[in-house]
Amino acid sequence: MTEGILFDAAMLTTLALTLKLATVTTVLLLALGTPLAWWLSRGGGLWKEIVATLVSLPIVLPPTVLGFYLLIAMGPNSPLTDLLGFKLSFTFAGLVVGSVIYSLPFVVNPIRNAFVAMGPRPMEVAATLRASPLDAFFTVALPQAAPGLITGAILGFAHTVGEFGVVLMIGGGIPGRTKVLSVTIFDYVETLEWDKAHVLAGGMLAMSFVVILAMMLIERRYGTGARR
């Protein structure tokens, strides 16, 4: 029974789509979140606190609320659609945008904490050695913040795989286009196909355990932030 579910053509397509979404989202989150985390970690100020609050908002905001407003923003009559010339709702690109916004705090916050834990001294030393700010960032800050980057990448990937409310609101669960594993589990439960739901839910439960274990091992080895 289990093999029949896992190796079903439709299930393999759903699995591939889910992994593709999580991978693309994680790459974009690291590319966008790392410089944002660096900026937030350098000093304070009202604007930085406002941006930090906006970044962390998806942690407490119900996914359906975020998904609802994203659906409106991506709809056919929205200013964003007029600007782009095409709508993002019910498309893979729309899922990526929604996933990046929804998972942003799970990537930015660990990286920001790693930069803060590093302190200003390593960058000051690099400056005395005549390293440019950009060189110092790539050769000093990023290596020392590696544990935060790893934790952020793991959290971002796992959180994207487990998304439900946002992806359902934005994507609608179209097979082969926007239907991911979490939506598939919901469909199985609605149709009373408990065996199939158990297989997928059990797999995601095991993945969540591995993610948390990996984070704990990283923190145990490197501490909560970067190496001193």
Curated annotation (Swiss-Prot):
Q: Where in the cell is it found?
A: Cell inner membrane
Q: How does it assemble?
A: Homodimer.
So where does this one cross the membrane?
21-41, 54-74, 88-108, 133-153, 154-174, 198-218
Q: List the disulfide bonds.
A: none
> NCBIfam families, from UniProt?
modB_ABC (TIGR02141)
The entry's function note states: Part of the binding-protein-dependent transport system for molybdenum; probably responsible for the translocation of the substrate across the membrane.
Q: Name one GO cellular component term.
A: plasma membrane
| Domain annotation ABC transmembrane type-1: ranges | 15-217
- What family does the database annotate? Belongs to the binding-protein-dependent transport system permease family. CysTW subfamily.
Alphabetically, the GO molecular function entries are: molybdate ion transmembrane transporter activity
Q: Do you know which InterPro entries this protein is assigned to?
A: MetI-like, MetI-like_sf, ModB_ABC
SUPFAM superfamilies documented for this protein? MetI-like
Q: How does it sit in the membrane?
A: Multi-pass membrane protein
Print the keywords alphabetically.
Answer: Cell inner membrane, Cell membrane, Membrane, Molybdenum, Transmembrane, Transmembrane helix, Transport
Q: What is this protein called?
A: Molybdenum transport system permease protein ModB
Q: Which Gene3D superfamilies match?
A: MetI-like (1.10.3720.10)
